[in-house]
Regions:
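An N-cap/entry alpha-helix motif that binds or orients negatively charged groups
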Residues: 1-17, 125-183
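N-terminal capping/small domains of soluble enzymes
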Residues: 1-109
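Conserved phosphate-coordination/catalytic loops
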Residues: 57, 81, 178-185
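Alpha-helix-loop-beta-strand connector modules within alpha/beta enzyme cores
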Residues: 68-73, 186-188, 193-195
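Glycine-rich, aromatic-flanked loop segments that form ligand/cofactor-binding clefts
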Residues: 107-111, 149-152
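Glycine/aspartate-rich loop-and-adjacent alpha/beta segment that forms the canonical ThDP
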Residues: 110-128
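Conserved small/polar residues in nucleotide/adenosyl-binding loops
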Residues: 196-203
């Protein structure tokens, strides 16, 4: 009561970084499926409003590309890969590119049965089928932008594995082949030591 709201201040501090809004963008994979500017547009918007941009391992722009276009605070969503070298590569690149924090994702050690994806034959990048051709025809501007911009790829991992390149691959197949189902607290400890700011997932048991 009678707390002055003449000049409200929504700013807060997250991971030691002051941000202008008490919210930030969650990591979203494969944003170029929705718009040809994808991750870059999201990073610019987050910087404009003074909050964190969160990048998915499965982004369609690279860590370095985002670092070059955005001076705002950035967080990286990390998956533990079966290939430790790839996990280390992602951590090192984030540190070199000035990402302020890292979020270790632990809910994808086994891919879910996404029946809609199976039904529609969803792959990344999209492959040509009768259904997809009909969808492209109904969205001509999306199809034009997709065809006239750089090739679709999982830009953070395509240099390391062909399964992140322009070869059409089911997302669940990629997860099952690349992510480590044996991930444990030892992996979380390893990432925490490797990267100072690791966002923790807390439960009563943990």
């Amino acid at each position: 009561i009678l707390a002055s709201v003449g000049e409200p201040d929504l700013s807060t501090t997250v991971f030691g970084q002051k941000i202008d809004l008490p919210i930030f963008l969650s990591p979203t994979a494969m944003q170029r499926l929705y718009h040809h500017d994808g991750d870059k547009a999201s990073a610019r918007a987050a910087e404009k409003f003074g909050t964190f941009y969160s990048m998915s391992t499965m982004a369609t722009s690279s860590i370095e590309e985002i670092a070059n276009i955005s001076g705002g605070p950035k967080l990286f969503q990390l998956y533990i890969h079966k290939d430790q070298g790839l996990t280390d590569n992602l951590i090192d690149r984030c540190k070199s590119s000035g990402f302020k924090a890292m979020c270790l994702t632990v809910d994808t050690v086994v891919a879910g049965n996404r029946e809609r994806d199976h039904r529609w034959g969803f792959t990344t990048p999209p492959k040509l089928t009768l259904k997809s051709l009909m969808s492209f025809a109904m969205h001509p501007m999306w199809a034009f932008n997709y065809l006239t911009n750089k090739k679709f790829e999982l830009a953070n991992v395509s240099h390391w594995t062909k399964k992140g390149s322009s070869i059409a691959k089911g997302v669940m197949d990629y997860i099952n082949e690349q992510y480590d189902p044996a991930m444990s607290w030892k992996d979380a400890e390893y990432v925490a030591v490797s990267y100072t700011h690791l966002r923790a997932h807390e439960t009563h048991e943990n």
